[in-house]
């Protein structure tokens, strides 16, 4: 079973964090939510409280198939300011394992860590200048090697289905999308 860690910082964007968690779990992926704050309870940018599965200090993360960074502000900024998160992301990328980020996180975190150098990437409008060394695509979802980026809240579903296809397979991703009636929305 594939293993994903999702880092939750105060100020995360609700939809961008929870839709991928939901879709991946429906697809049989082992997803662990991780609080990077001082408490398991993390508050979203819109005041929704989520209790993470573990605290950052409890994680090893070396078994991660994917590290996922939700967007939202100040959530993305809080992720970047956490030295432990930055080390995990850099190590994950250096090992050639998957890293994914959505909204502000591609620029605020991945760009500033040098992970996007020479890659194609997307992000929420206004954060393009932070995609250091990347070619901005303006697409909802962009995949370049082991890095997947997405634009913003509206991209949360296609982003989640792309991650599921990468981790499990396209057939499973399509089945989950059908069961969630996503394909009918896009018709």
What are the language-model segments listed below?
Residues 3-6, 12, 27-36, 53-187:
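Active-site-adjacent pocket-lining segments in enzyme domains
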Residues 12-16, 41:
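Short N-terminal binding/cap micro-motifs at the start of the first secondary-structure element
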Residues 18, 35-38:
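Short glycine/proline-centered loop/turn elements that form peptide/ligand docking sites
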Residues 21:
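Histidine-anchored nucleotide/phosphate-binding helix
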Residues 41-53:
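A cross-family phosphate/adenosyl-ligand binding-site feature
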């Amino acid at each position: 079973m594939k293993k994903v860690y999702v880092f939750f910082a105060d100020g995360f964007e609700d939809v961008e964090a929870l839709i991928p968690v939901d879709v991946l779990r429906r697809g049989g992926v082992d997803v662990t939510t991780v609080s990077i704050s001082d408490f398991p309870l993390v508050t979203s940018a819109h005041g929704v409280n989520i209790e993470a599965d573990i605290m950052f200090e409890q994680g090893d993360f070396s078994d991660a198939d994917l590290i996922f960074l939700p967007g939202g502000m100040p959530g993305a900024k809080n992720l970047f300011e956490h030295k432990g998160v930055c080390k995990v992301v850099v190590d994950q990328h250096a090992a050639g394992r998957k890293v994914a980020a959505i909204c502000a996180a591609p620029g605020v975190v991945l760009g500033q860590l040098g992970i996007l150098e020479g890659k194609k990437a997307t992000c929420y409008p206004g954060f393009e200048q932070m995609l250091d060394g990347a070619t901005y695509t303006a697409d909802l979802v962009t995949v370049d090697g082991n890095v997947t980026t997405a634009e913003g809240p509206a991209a949360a579903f296609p982003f989640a289905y792309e991650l599921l296809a990468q981790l499990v397979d396209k057939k499973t991703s399509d089945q989950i999308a059908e069961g969630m009636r996503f394909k009918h929305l896009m018709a």
